[in-house]
């Protein structure tokens, strides 16, 4: 148990702010991140860091262990699911590069790339497949350089958009193709402070196959030391065997389906890791069956059932999705009584 009392020190980190770049279509997940590196307390995790200006934490209401006593405050309860997977993941290729020569080994290993002063570099990075995880960007120098990191599942046909409705977007076509296509996606933004050994890692996980990286420098070159992902998802392990000799396409379909199931399961099941990250119980029923067909792990299924119970409103009706800040009920609660009344 961590003793988080008034002996702890704290400060308000002014370096971060939400980055609200408009995302076309129905996007209801969190915002991107804006980091002003000059305001970040670099080295705070090191024992030699000077924390003399940090303030003592104020003790709030004490935590109470569930089952140990009657208590009106917050109860400390065991986590119902195991920790998420955290696995290093390297990009496969630079598909487009503008304004800089790509050094041998870049992306595959930790290889530096220098962006000259007063220049602009654009890189389109390809992960090879869709993933969910935390993106890390390691860099040095480049004071006042602007770094924009955008994320997309796929690229779109290159014609102009006349609508913001996702169902009216141009077609994606072959997702392996990038030439002549348009990048649409949410983004993070960093303003470099000119220091050495900077590490920007997203606070929340992102979803991407493609990452669009743009760096605009000021009067100092910026050294991009590495860029990579850390895959994060619920630690499912596929425990089934499947064989269909002469039908390789079926094995490929199973591979794609299992990847989809994994990316749509983090701390909850979710309908879509890119646009919504919401646990709809109609979708969850299907995901739970996939889980029980392919694994011996029922923790997520039990967790979803419990969260469905927690979503029940005063009328005794479950919400259509939960956890969610927006109250929404399933149409089945309307259609079924209507059907019964018509009998």
How does the language model describe each region?
Residues 332-343:
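Single conserved hydrophobic/aromatic residue that forms the stacking wall/gate
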């Amino acid at each position: 148990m961590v003793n988080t009392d008034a002996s702890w020190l704290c400060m308000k980190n002014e370096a971060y702010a939400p980055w609200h770049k408009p995302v076309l279509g129905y996007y209801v997940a969190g915002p991107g991140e804006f980091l002003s590196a000059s305001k970040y307390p670099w080295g705070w995790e090191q024992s030699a860091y000077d924390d003399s200006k940090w303030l003592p934490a104020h003790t709030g209401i004490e935590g109470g262990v569930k089952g140990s006593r009657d208590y009106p405050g917050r109860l400390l309860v065991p986590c119902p699911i195991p920790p998420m997977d955290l696995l290093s993941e390297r990009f496969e290729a630079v598909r487009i590069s503008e304004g800089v020569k790509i050094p041998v080994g870049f992306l595959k290993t930790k290889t530096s790339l220098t962006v000259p002063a007063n220049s602009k570099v654009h890189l389109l990075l390809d992960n090879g497949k869709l993933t969910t995880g935390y993106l890390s960007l390691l860099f040095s120098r480049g004071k006042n350089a602007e770094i924009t990191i955008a994320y997309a599942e796929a690229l779109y046909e290159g014609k102009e958009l006349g609508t913001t409705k996702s169902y009216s977007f141009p077609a994606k076509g072959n997702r392996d193709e990038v030439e002549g296509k348009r990048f649409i996606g949410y983004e993070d933004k960093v303003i470099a402070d000119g220091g050495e050994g900077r590490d920007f890692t997203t606070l929340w996980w992102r979803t991407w196959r493609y990452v669009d990286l743009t760096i605009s420098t000021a009067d100092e070159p910026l050294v991009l030391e590495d860029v990579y992902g850390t895959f994060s998802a619920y630690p499912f392990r596929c425990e089934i065997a499947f064989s269909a000799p002469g039908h390789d396409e079926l094995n490929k379909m199973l591979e794609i389906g299992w990847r989809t199931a994994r990316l749509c399961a983090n701390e909850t099941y979710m309908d879509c890791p890119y646009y919504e990250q919401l646990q709809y119980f109609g979708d969850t029923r299907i995901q739970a069956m996939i889980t029980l067909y392919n694994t011996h792990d029922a923790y997520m299924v039990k967790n979803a059932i419990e969260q469905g119970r927690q979503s029940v409103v005063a009328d005794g009706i479950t919400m259509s999705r939960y956890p969610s800040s927006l109250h929404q009920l399933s149409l089945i609660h309307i259609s079924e009584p209507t059907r019964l009344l018509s009998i």
